[in-house]
Design a protein with these regions (language model features):
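A short, conserved alpha-helix within the catalytic core of class I
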Residues: 95-107
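Short alpha-helix
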Residues: 132-148
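Core SAM-dependent methyltransferase catalytic element
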Residues: 159-187
Length: 187
């Protein structure tokens, strides 16, 4: 099997489930992209992706023409992507509260936010355990409400895969979705 196949296989089931809702035109932001597992998954589905992290060498090494990279300190006060607009934003295993309320202004109307990260109680299973990096109960729902997002799906649960953890997951639309939500995605 190829490295590309292995990377895609490691993509989050949450991202896999809701990626088909992303409008086909436009640019998808993979924020805190890490190894590029979601960038590569999205590119394999035909999306153009901007993969952003403090170290993007692993993503660059994938050599996919639909993926462009940008190396950024994600916790700087002034963030150069605030003026950009995306058709979707994907965030997994990353939380920096001072910037979370900036995400909606970077998302085009009718487009998708897919967010999944660790939640309170995760310290029982390992890292992260610092409360600064763990979502409080219902925090992503409160975020969605604060910014008038339509929630497609939300979970605040214990998972066993890829490792035992407490996570919150949100798929939400800014305004009305540009396309019909298929029944399989409706709660």
């Amino acid at each position: 099997m190829s490295v590309e196949h292995d990377v895609i296989q490691n993509a989050s089931s949450w991202v896999r489930r809701f990626a088909p809702l992303i409008p086909k035109n436009g640019l998808v932001l993979d924020l805190a992209c890490g190894s590029g597992r979601h960038s590569l998954l999205l590119a394999s589905m035909g999306y153009e992706v901007l993969a952003v992290d403090q170290d993007v060498r692993a993503v660059d090494a994938l050599g996919n023409s639909l993926i462009s990279t940008r190396e950024l300190n994600l916790e700087e006060d002034e963030w150069p992507l605030w003026d950009c607009e995306f058709s979707a934003i994907v965030v997994t295993n990353y939380l920096y509260r001072p910037h979370i309320d900036q995400l909606p202004q970077m998302l085009q109307k009718g487009c998708i936010l897919i967010y999944e990260t660790f939640a309170q109680g995760n310290g029982e299973f390992g890292k992260p355990s610092n409360p600064n990096f763990l979502l409080n109960s219902g925090e992503l729902l409160a975020f969605a409400s604060r910014h008038d997002f339509k929630v497609v799906a939300f979970e605040d649960i214990y998972v066993e895969q890829p490792k035992p953890a407490m996570v919150q997951r949100l798929c939400a639309v800014k305004g009305e979705l540009k396309q019909h939500i298929p029944l399989q995605f409706q709660g």
